From Swiss-Prot:
1D-myo-inositol 3-phosphate binds at residues 17, 28-33, 86, 119, 143, 163. UDP-N-acetyl-alpha-D-glucosamine binds at residues 23-24, 31, 237, 242, 325, 333. Pfam families: Glyco_trans_4_4, Glycos_transf_1. This is D-inositol 3-phosphate glycosyltransferase. Coiled coil: none annotated. Homodimer. The gene is mshA. It catalyses: 1D-myo-inositol 3-phosphate + UDP-N-acetyl-alpha-D-glucosamine = 1D-myo-inositol 2-acetamido-2-deoxy-alpha-D-glucopyranoside 3-phosphate + UDP + H(+).
């Protein structure tokens, strides 16, 4: 008779530097926030409770907030509430860990079956909590310093040595490493020497209930966009890594080559400054003025998901020119709404976008090459329509429920591995 599999009842999810309650597209909030929220909700629907530990960023935040039945967000005091740069967070990890351990100590031993940490800072906390509680650590990198440093944008700062070391330590101690794509798995193995047997690929997903096709004309009316405009859309945090400047420069070239485009082209950017982009919050506005296209550029603040879905539907193309992406949720959201994507052929975007079927992948970051690719697509409505249909089919393969179900399997496998290797009484 086969042994009964151990059940995972509750997961401690650690997200030190960004709260799942924050609006994606501003500050440090981005795709990782979406990932944590969507996965937590669906794990809870599977009967696995999730408690998310994140740093308190305002004095008036309650100790805990129920995000969804079975999902609790716990605010941990560690350092000043506001104006703490991410570069200063390593100095607050001991305080954060202390808060996590104090929370666990309020309950009977064994409250958490698994720890899932997100980003290297959280991995450091997860490492020590794993040692204290005797439970497995599952870690998702989301981005990796060595990869980012290999593909730096012009003017961007390299990731510091402390992060590289911290990531190497987390890779060494994690029981399972979750990679978003096969590409990321290969980078973990080749750059960080992760044992292949501890690396599992689990694709992120998209909320197919929110991001779904709907009439373009109605979306444009709601957003105040002309019905006959040609709309290029960028969604994301405004920082060198995301390369929104490439889209603006490409648009300027398109207008210079075809002046009649100026009266119809709209270049929309939805998002706020983040990371190294905070040094110049007016970067895109200044660049648009410098390029002489301020009249066609529309800068919008980060939008909640229902409004964001309208932006995708209203666009002819979503442009994702990032220097690197571990996956690229923006690309997937756009495709789920039926809008093809022109994306840089880097990292996880090669998985998120199916070249020639749901969009196109562009090599390099030369604005002239991007201008040619964008113009070619805008000039071919039949091809755009075919890519739109392909985008919906492609995105339908990436529901969050499938992501959560696979993660639940990873948690169970990690739990069974720990119980096979830890001697009886070792944690008593």
């Amino acid at each position: 008779m086969a042994a009964r599999r151990r059940r995972v009842n509750r997961v401690a999810t650690i997200s030190v530097h960004t709260s799942p309650l924050d609006q994606p597209g501003t500050g440090d909030a981005g795709g990782m926030n979406v990932y944590i929220v969507e996965v937590a909700r669906r794990l809870a629907d599977l009967g696995i409770e999730v408690e998310i530990f994140t740093r308190r960023t305002a004095r008036d935040l309650p100790p805990a907030v129920e995000l969804h039945p079975g999902v609790l967000v716990r605010h941990v005091t560690a350092g000043p509430y506001e104006e703490l740069d991410r570069a200063d967070l390593p100095g607050q990890l001991c305080s954060f860990l202390s808060g996590v351990l104090r929370t666990e100590a309020m309950y009977e031993p064994g409250r958490y079956d698994v720890i899932h940490s997100h980003y290297w800072l959280s991995g450091q906390v997860g490492w020590l909590a794993k040692e204290r509680w005797g439970v497995p650590l599952v870690h998702t990198m989301h981005t990796m310093a060595k990869v980012k440093n290999l593909r730096l944008a012009e003017g961007d700062k390299p990731e510091p040595a402390i992060r590289v070391l911290g990531e190497e330590q987390v890779v060494d101690v994690a029981d399972r490493l979750v990679a978003n794509t096969v590409t990321e798995a290969r980078e973990l193995i080749e750059l960080y020497h992760a044992p292949p047997e501890r690396v599992t690929v689990v694709n992120p997903g998209v909320n197919l209930n929110i991001f779904r096709p709907a009439p373009k004309a109605a979306a444009r009316r709601r957003l105040g966009l002309p019905a006959d405009a040609r709309v290029l859309l960028f969604v994301g945090r405004i920082q060198p890594l995301k390369a929104p400047d490439v889209m603006l420069r490409a648009a300027a070239i398109m207008i210079a080559e075809r002046p009649e485009l100026r009266s119809r082209l709209i270049v929309a950017c939805v998002g706020g400054p983040s990371g190294n982009g905070l040094a110049r919050p007016s970067l895109l506005a200044d660049l648009a003025a410098e390029l002489g296209i301020a009249d066609v550029v529309r800068l919008e603040p980060p939008a909640p998901q229902p409004e964001l879905a309208d932006w995708y539907r209203a666009a002819d193309l979503t442009v994702v020119p990032s220097h690197n992406e571990s996956f690229g949720l923006v690309a997937l959201e756009s495709q789920a709404c039926g809008t093809p994507v022109a994306a840089a052929s880097v990292g996880g975007l090669r998985t998120a976008v199916r070249h020639g079927v749901s969009g196109v992948l562009v090599d390099g970051h030369d604005p002239r090459q991007w201008a040619a690719s964008l113009a070619e697509l805008l000039d071919d409505p039949d091809r755009l329509a075919a890519l739109s249909a392909g985008a919906v089919r492609h995105a339908a393969r990436f529901g969050w429920s499938a992501t959560a179900a696979r993660l639940a399997e990873v948690y169970t496998e990690a739990l069974e591995r720990v119980h096979r290797t830890v001697p009886v009484g070792a944690n008593s």
